[in-house]
């Protein structure tokens, strides 16, 4: 079981009013998830409006990993952001080899833009993590009547076609890559 992710706002647990979420909210939720036996993986639930400029993803991962012993799922941007997340993971694990032997971050991307198109950045990142042999979780999100046909069977057919395209891409990138369907 995985938590939801990336909400920009939160209902303040003290005053009940909606506000931008912060790193402290990530920490609070991470501690809660850490103690819930029915949750297997923490998908960083909220954004961190207080993250330093240029360290948005790193700030989210650092806070989540500091406060939750379960695997963490999240995403980052190509380039420096992606590299800083990996450097954090290597430091926590003790080395790059130790992290790759037992990775605790699942990199989550939505490379398919329904209907049947692929986003360049997310696809690039999916291929990068696949090449590295690191866990990636890809989501396909066809919406019946909006980005896919109106009927349930047609939406399921399109969603499966989109997932199969991702599966084929991952297998072409690194044959034998495990997939989560």
Provide a role label for each language-model segment:
Residues 1-14:
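Glycine-rich, N-terminal phosphate-binding loop and its surrounding beta-alpha-beta segment
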Residues 12-181:
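Helix-rich catalytic cores of soluble enzyme domains
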């Amino acid at each position: 079981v995985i938590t939801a992710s990336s909400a920009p706002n939160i209902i303040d647990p003290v005053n009940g009013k909606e506000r931008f979420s912060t790193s402290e909210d990530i920490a609070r939720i991470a501690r809660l998830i850490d103690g819930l036996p029915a949750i297997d993986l923490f998908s960083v639930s909220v954004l961190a409006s207080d993250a330093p400029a240029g360290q948005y993803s790193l700030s989210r991962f650092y806070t989540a990993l500091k406060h939750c012993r379960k695997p963490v799922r999240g995403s980052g941007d190509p380039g420096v952001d992606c590299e800083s997340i990996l450097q954090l993971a290597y430091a926590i694990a003790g080395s790059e080899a130790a992290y790759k032997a037992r990775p605790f971050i699942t990199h989550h991307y939505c490379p398919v833009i329904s209907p049947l198109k692929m986003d360049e950045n997310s696809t690039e990142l999916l291929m990068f993590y696949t090449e590295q042999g690191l866990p990636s979780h890809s989501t396909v999100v066809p919406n019946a009547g909006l980005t896919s046909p109106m009927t349930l069977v047609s939406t399921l057919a399109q969603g499966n076609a989109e997932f199969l395209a991702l599966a084929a891409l991952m297998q072409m990138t690194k044959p034998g890559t495990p997939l989560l369907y």
